[in-house]
Amino acid sequence: GRATFILYIMQSFSISYIIFMLYKISNIMFDNEDTNYLVVILSGLCFPLIFYVAFVYGLLPGMFLTLLAYYYFIKYTKHKKWYMLVISAISINVAILFIGNNLIHMLAIFSAAVIYLIRVKDKKVIAFMVSCLFLMSASKSLIYNYYEVKSQKSIADGVPKITWIAMGMQEGDREAGWWNRFNYDIMPEEDYDTNRITEISKDSIKQRAEVFKKNPRYAVDFYQRKYENQFLEPTFQSLLVTAPQRNFDNETKLEKVKDFFIKQIYFDETHHVLTFIMKVFQVFVYVFSVVFAVNVYKKKKEILTIIPVAFIGGTLFHMIWEAKSRYVFPYFVFLIPLAAYGLIIVRNKITEYRKNKEEKNEKGNI
């Protein structure tokens, strides 16, 4: 219907703004035109990002707002305008309202802010961090209070967070640590008693920790599978969560033509080709992000630490939490500017090597 169409348009705008902000972040961090152009090209080749247009959720707007927060914090370190910190603080807090896991990105910004504070002694940065924490607490309370007043009912605490950690240590329906209905099953069984559910979750964590202790090979295998099925899954569930859930029988001729392409993308030969392309792209981004990290770790620039710290923090968090490859997708997309710069570094090294070799050959011929 019309509402769905409008949501898809909003999703499309989110993707456009994500690519734009990746470009802006690349420009402000590296000030290199070749890197900037490469970021735009790579973003367009990130097929999971395109497929997520059909997944109406807080993922894409949360990614855009996180990048906006990154950008204005980095810009503040260069231009020292207080309003930039205000935009950054508001953006990251709205991003957290969309997806709670975006708190990791706030902490990544804080890590860079602390380094910057030690180096520059800028009190505005302290105010920025305090404001972020205040906004995070106040916005949540404001939303809860609003709905309690409107509904005339108190909002329950919901599923205890520890249940997601317990589930992250169990074998899942899909793979190690993935969703297995653990928390949803025990909630009605324990009559929604959060204290009892918390105790059961703690017991489950202790039991699984004991299993891992007695079977170290299994523990390594479990967390290896959990890592691979999140960070090395090339589609990041983009084809799974956007796959059509309808019956393809009794179609008109026009629907058959349209659905031929849908079937190819999601179920047939083209699906395997797309998955392979996404895998190549994923390997490319990871490899050249490592090249970036190796070449710039000695540079004492706090702005270069935000994205790597967020990626490391996200990795640690999602190895503890319930697993899904779509959870880690934002961290991967945010690596694109680093990978682009890593490729430029390699290109420059090759160019320099060839130039030096030619100069040596010329000297040898004289």
Question: Which residues fall in each region the model found?
Answer:
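Transmembrane-helix motifs of polytopic, lipid-linked glycan transferases
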Residues: 9-30, 65-68, 287-292
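Transmembrane-embedded, aromatic-rich helix segments that form part
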Residues: 100-116, 127-128, 339, 343
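Transmembrane-helix signature of polytopic, membrane-embedded enzymes
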Residues: 22-45, 303-307
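Membrane-proximal stem/loop segments at transmembrane-domain junctions that anchor or position
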Residues: 147-254
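Multi-pass, polyprenyl lipid-linked donor-dependent membrane glycosyltransferases
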Residues: 6-14, 38-68, 73, 82, ...
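Membrane-interface anchor segments at the N-terminal boundary of transmembrane helices
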Residues: 2-11, 225-307
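Short hydrophobic alpha-helices at membrane interfaces in multi-pass membrane enzymes
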Residues: 34, 40, 75-93, 123-128
